[in-house]
Amino acid sequence: MNEIMLSIRDLHAQIGARKILKGINLEVRAGEVHAIMGPNGSGKSTLSSVLAGREGYEVTAGSVEYLGRNLLEMEPEDRARAGVFLAFQYPVEIPGVGNMYFLRTALNAQRKARGEEELDAVDFLGLAREKMKLV
Protein backbone atom coordinates (compact mmCIF):
# COMPACT_ATOMS: atom_id res chain seq x y z
CA MET A 1 0.00 0.00 0.00
CA ASN A 2 1.32 3.46 -0.92
CA GLU A 3 1.98 6.09 1.72
CA ILE A 4 -0.66 8.82 2.11
CA MET A 5 0.99 12.02 0.93
CA LEU A 6 -1.93 14.44 1.30
CA SER A 7 -4.99 14.03 3.49
CA ILE A 8 -7.73 16.68 3.50
CA ARG A 9 -10.59 16.12 5.94
CA ASP A 10 -13.81 18.17 6.12
CA LEU A 11 -12.01 21.35 5.02
CA HIS A 12 -14.03 24.57 5.28
CA ALA A 13 -12.59 27.92 4.20
CA GLN A 14 -13.82 31.41 3.49
CA ILE A 15 -12.74 34.84 2.33
CA GLY A 16 -14.25 37.46 4.60
CA ALA A 17 -17.84 36.36 5.24
CA ARG A 18 -18.06 34.39 1.97
CA LYS A 19 -17.91 30.64 2.63
CA ILE A 20 -16.27 28.89 -0.32
CA LEU A 21 -15.05 25.45 0.75
CA LYS A 22 -17.73 23.51 2.58
CA GLY A 23 -16.39 20.15 3.67
CA ILE A 24 -13.72 19.08 1.16
CA ASN A 25 -12.30 15.57 1.59
CA LEU A 26 -9.39 14.24 -0.45
CA GLU A 27 -6.69 11.63 0.00
CA VAL A 28 -3.70 11.35 -2.33
CA ARG A 29 -1.28 8.45 -2.04
CA ALA A 30 2.28 8.31 -3.35
CA GLY A 31 2.30 7.66 -7.09
CA GLU A 32 -1.26 8.87 -7.69
CA VAL A 33 -2.19 11.77 -9.93
CA HIS A 34 -5.39 13.70 -9.29
CA ALA A 35 -7.05 16.48 -11.29
CA ILE A 36 -9.16 19.05 -9.47
CA MET A 37 -11.94 19.97 -11.88
CA GLY A 38 -15.14 21.96 -11.68
CA PRO A 39 -16.98 24.96 -13.03
CA ASN A 40 -15.92 28.53 -12.39
CA GLY A 41 -16.53 29.49 -8.79
CA SER A 42 -16.52 25.94 -7.43
CA GLY A 43 -13.49 26.46 -5.17
CA LYS A 44 -10.55 25.03 -7.14
CA SER A 45 -8.41 28.15 -6.78
CA THR A 46 -9.47 28.59 -3.17
CA LEU A 47 -8.40 25.04 -2.34
CA SER A 48 -5.03 25.61 -4.03
CA SER A 49 -4.55 28.92 -2.25
CA VAL A 50 -5.44 27.45 1.15
CA LEU A 51 -3.00 24.58 0.64
CA ALA A 52 -0.23 27.00 -0.37
CA GLY A 53 -0.95 29.28 2.61
CA ARG A 54 -1.91 32.42 0.73
CA GLU A 55 -3.10 35.36 2.82
CA GLY A 56 -6.76 36.31 2.92
CA TYR A 57 -8.14 32.78 3.23
CA GLU A 58 -9.50 31.64 6.58
CA VAL A 59 -9.78 27.94 7.35
CA THR A 60 -12.78 27.59 9.66
CA ALA A 61 -12.84 23.80 10.07
CA GLY A 62 -11.11 20.62 9.00
CA SER A 63 -7.56 19.40 8.73
CA VAL A 64 -4.85 19.03 6.10
CA GLU A 65 -1.86 16.73 6.53
CA TYR A 66 1.03 16.59 4.07
CA LEU A 67 3.52 13.76 4.57
CA GLY A 68 2.25 13.38 8.13
CA ARG A 69 2.66 17.06 9.03
CA ASN A 70 -0.13 19.53 9.78
CA LEU A 71 0.05 21.69 6.66
CA LEU A 72 -2.21 24.39 8.11
CA GLU A 73 0.31 25.11 10.89
CA MET A 74 3.20 25.60 8.45
CA GLU A 75 4.30 28.98 7.11
CA PRO A 76 3.97 29.41 3.32
CA GLU A 77 7.76 29.34 2.96
CA ASP A 78 7.95 26.03 4.83
CA ARG A 79 5.14 24.62 2.69
CA ALA A 80 7.06 25.61 -0.45
CA ARG A 81 10.25 23.97 0.83
CA ALA A 82 8.21 20.82 1.50
CA GLY A 83 6.87 20.92 -2.07
CA VAL A 84 3.49 22.64 -1.70
CA PHE A 85 3.33 25.89 -3.65
CA LEU A 86 1.55 27.62 -6.51
CA ALA A 87 3.33 28.04 -9.82
CA PHE A 88 2.24 29.95 -12.88
CA GLN A 89 0.65 27.85 -15.61
CA TYR A 90 2.51 29.94 -18.19
CA PRO A 91 5.55 31.31 -16.36
CA VAL A 92 7.34 34.38 -17.60
CA GLU A 93 10.58 33.47 -19.32
CA ILE A 94 13.64 34.98 -17.70
CA PRO A 95 16.41 35.56 -20.24
CA GLY A 96 19.46 33.47 -19.41
CA VAL A 97 17.60 31.16 -17.00
CA GLY A 98 16.72 27.83 -18.59
CA ASN A 99 14.01 25.51 -17.33
CA MET A 100 16.51 22.87 -16.23
CA TYR A 101 18.46 25.39 -14.16
CA PHE A 102 15.24 26.67 -12.59
CA LEU A 103 14.01 23.15 -11.77
CA ARG A 104 17.40 22.12 -10.32
CA THR A 105 17.43 25.22 -8.12
CA ALA A 106 13.90 24.45 -6.86
CA LEU A 107 14.75 20.80 -6.19
CA ASN A 108 17.96 21.71 -4.40
CA ALA A 109 16.08 24.16 -2.17
CA GLN A 110 13.82 21.29 -1.11
CA ARG A 111 16.75 18.92 -0.62
CA LYS A 112 18.59 21.51 1.47
CA ALA A 113 15.50 22.04 3.66
CA ARG A 114 15.39 18.26 4.27
CA GLY A 115 19.10 18.17 5.14
CA GLU A 116 20.00 16.28 1.96
CA GLU A 117 22.96 16.91 -0.30
CA GLU A 118 22.27 19.16 -3.29
CA LEU A 119 22.50 17.70 -6.81
CA ASP A 120 25.05 19.04 -9.25
CA ALA A 121 24.08 19.65 -12.88
CA VAL A 122 25.15 16.19 -14.09
CA ASP A 123 23.28 14.31 -11.35
CA PHE A 124 20.20 16.46 -11.84
CA LEU A 125 20.18 15.83 -15.59
CA GLY A 126 20.36 12.08 -14.94
CA LEU A 127 17.46 12.31 -12.49
CA ALA A 128 15.42 14.41 -14.93
CA ARG A 129 15.98 11.90 -17.76
CA GLU A 130 14.97 9.05 -15.47
CA LYS A 131 11.76 10.82 -14.42
CA MET A 132 10.89 11.78 -18.02
CA LYS A 133 10.68 8.06 -18.86
CA LEU A 134 7.70 7.88 -16.49
CA VAL A 135 5.72 10.47 -18.44
Where are each of the predicted segments found?
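Short hydrophobic beta-strand immediately N-terminal to the Walker A/P-loop
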Residues: 34-36, 48
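Short coil-to-beta microelement around the adenine-binding A-loop and adjacent beta1/P-loop entry
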Residues: 18-19, 78
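Conserved structural motif at the start of ABC-family nucleotide-binding domains
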Residues: 6-8, 21
